[in-house]
A protein has these predicted regions:
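Bacterial N-terminal signal peptides that target proteins for export
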Residues: 2-18
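Accessory "access/gating" subregions that flank catalytic or transport cores
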Residues: 308-310
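Ligand-binding beta-strand-loop-alpha-helix segment within the catalytic cores
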Residues: 414
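Bacterial N-terminal signal peptides
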Residues: 16-27
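His/Asp/Glu-enriched, well-ordered alpha-helical/loop segment
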Residues: 352-362, 366-392, 396, 402, ...
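Divalent metal-binding segments
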Residues: 31-41, 46, 50-304, 313-370, ...
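Residue-level marker of beta-strand positions
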Residues: 91, 141, 520-523, 552
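Extracellular/periplasmic ectodomains of large secreted or surface enzymes and adhesion receptors
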Residues: 555-563
Length: 563
């Protein structure tokens, strides 16, 4: 499929270096010139502005970008206290934004986890697990709570067994959650959770002798996750800080948080007030409830009391979501019941109230049938309370068709695309057949005129590395190299979807998403040129420096202890 380019410049013509100097305030007497704290020069600054301009240098004053332009012009702004970074030809992109992640709550388990995001072989995965055992005491839990699938292992993509995990971690209970479809446990974990004594428990897969294999199906593992120990108090803060460091290391500087738990968010607020928060959090939240008609009646007054946009550019609440009515579920792999008219009626009651109060909406919507059903209700709501300027979004969005996209365009509904195929592409093919190769149809979405952005739905349903997501969008390949997507897009349009378009989604288009004078200085210096590196190497791009609000929050050259 031929894809429209988002900007007015096409192909390599976008690589022309900007000639002028774009400065906050345009011009000013020397005495009024803000102090330039930092200049990055001799680089390839991929601004991702409306013209996809390429510059050489950028100046930062405080937490904002003061100027973008040529080396010579930007250098003139330097003062005696200005710090300089010679990029030596390296590429700089805007801080990457994920429009939908589940992370605040997962800070409670991050310290126990061995992440396999981007790991392509079973051997490498097991080596990481084995290495972890040398850093924990005997008997301590080791987790991997999602963000991977056995399909990503190019050398051996079969389920793990308890015996295999026993060899790697004989003295520690191990719990490995593969995305949201199954889990694998070693013998110590089976014993700790009482499964050896109760092999008939829900979801336990047994061998011919009736002995648990260590494999737990989706029907059973979710309940087990809730029995695992979590970090609290000071450990919770340390675990969450470790998670944020990993996000910064990946190039992420902001994310839409699907859920901002009341017991965790104050910690982030304190860090932000102290100038210590190294990532921006934009909350998708709701008052809860709404599982039956009576509960909906009780919920409606609470919607009127919701307070959005009362924070700042580090923490803010920007949308209602991601669930609306509990009886309407659209899960990844489980059997989906047919949508009932009475449930859609309750869904419409809630969304009508959301629209009446002028609130943005971000709603979990996966498959074709659900998209149709929800658009029917949204069109009915729109007749009573127009939603065009509310930035309502359908999230996940794996199976849209052209007719649905046209309806969304007329309504002004946004698409938050979360490609589960990055790790679950093989499973999608088994479950959906040929249709899986159009999940999600990026070229169709790009051509439709619907505003859309890329996210992950990490860290359990999907991996969290933005360059892995960008690689999938451009090459159509999942982790491990299997082609799982037909409708790919250009690397420019993919980057726009992971930066500028997501800034719009979280109502931060004046602050984030591009490297322009006046915007917040969220930047990522990478080890190779995103625009020219062979497409199959996009997944391997590594940030060497990440900046949030003019502060360096990750520096690959720094000692490990300070990264």
């Amino acid at each position: 499929m031929r894809v429209k380019r988002e900007s007015i410049m096409a192909g390599r013509a976008r690589a022309a270096v900007v000639v002028g100097l774009f400065v906050l305030g345009l011009s000013f007497p020397h005495a009024q010139q803000p102090q330039v704290d930092l200049i990055l020069s001799n680089g390839k600054i991929v601004t991702v502005d409306e013209r996809f301009t390429i510059a050489q240098a950028v100046a930062v004053a405080g937490d904002r970008i003061l100027a973008v332009g040529t080396n010579q012009d930007v250098s003139r702004l330097a003062g005696p206290a200005t710090r300089r970074i010679d990029l030596r030809g390296r590429t700089v992109v805007p801080g990457l934004i994920d429009n939908h992640m589940h992370l605040l709550r997962y800070g409670t388990t991050w310290k126990y986890e061995v992440r396999w995001d981007g790991v392509e072989t079973r051997k490498a995965a097991l080596d990481l697990l084995r290495a972890r055992t040398s850093h924990v005491k005997a008997g301590e839990w080791i987790y991997n709570l999602g963000g991977w699938a056995i399909e990503q292992f190019s050398d051996d993509a079969k389920p793990f067994t308890r015996e295999e995990l026993d060899k790697v971690a004989p003295n520690n209970p191990v719990f490995l959650q593969a995305s949201y479809y199954e889990a694998y446990l070693n013998s110590r974990a089976l014993q700790a959770l009482g499964i050896d004594q109760n092999p008939g428990a829900n979801g336990v897969v047994k061998d011919a002798a009736g002995r648990p294999t260590g494999r737990i199906s989706e029907e059973g593992f979710r309940a087990l996750v809730n029995k695992l120990p979590t970090a609290e108090g000071a450990d919770l803060e340390a675990s969450s800080l470790g998670m944020i460091k990993d996000l910064n290391r990946s190039g992420l500087t902001a994310f839409g948080s699907a859920g901002c738990e009341a017991d965790v968010l104050p910690i982030y607020r304190r860090w932000a007030d102290q100038g210590l928060l190294n990532i921006r959090v934009f909350c998708i939240t709701s008052p809860g409830g709404g599982g039956n008609p009576d509960a909906v009646t009780q919920l409606l007054p609470r919607i009127a009391q919701m307070k959005l946009f009362k924070g700042d550019n580090y923490i803010n609440h920007h949308a209602y979501g991601e669930g609306v009515y509990g009886a309407l579920s659209d899960p990844m792999f489980r059997h989906r019941e047919q949508t009932r008219a009475q449930d859609l009626e309750q869904w419409r009651r809630i969304t009508m109230e959301i629209a009446r109060h002028g609130l943005p909406l971000h709603v979990h919507t996966n498959f074709t049938e659900t998209i149709d059903a929800f658009l029917d209700q949204i069109e009915a709501v729109d007749k009573e309370y127009p939603i065009r300027n509310l930035r309502w979004a359908l999230a996940h969005f794996n199976q849209p068709n052209a007719a649905q996209l046209e309806r969304m365009k007329k309504l002004g509904v946004y698409a938050a695309v979360h490609p589960w195929a990055v790790i679950n592409g093989g499973i999608n093919v088994r479950q959906f057949g040929d249709a899986a190769y159009d999940m999600a149809p990026l070229a169709l979405i790009q051509n439709s005129g619907v505003t859309w952005g890329l996210g992950s739905d990490g860290s359990r349903a999907n991996q969290i590395l933005p360059f892995q997501t960008l690689s999938w969008a451009v090459t159509g390949k999942m982790v491990g190299g299997k082609k799982v997507l037909r409708q790919t897009i250009s690397r420019e349009d993919a980057l726009i979807a992971h930066t500028r378009k997501n800034a719009y989604f979280v109502f931060q288009e004046d602050n984030l998403g591009s490297i322009q004078a006046g915007k917040l200085a969220d930047l990522v210096v990478v080890d190779r040129d995103y625009l020219t590196v062979p497409a199959d190497q996009i997944k391997d791009i590594q940030p060497v420096l990440t900046m949030v609000g003019g502060r360096i929050v990750y520096d690959a050259a720094a000692p490990t202890s300070t990264q």
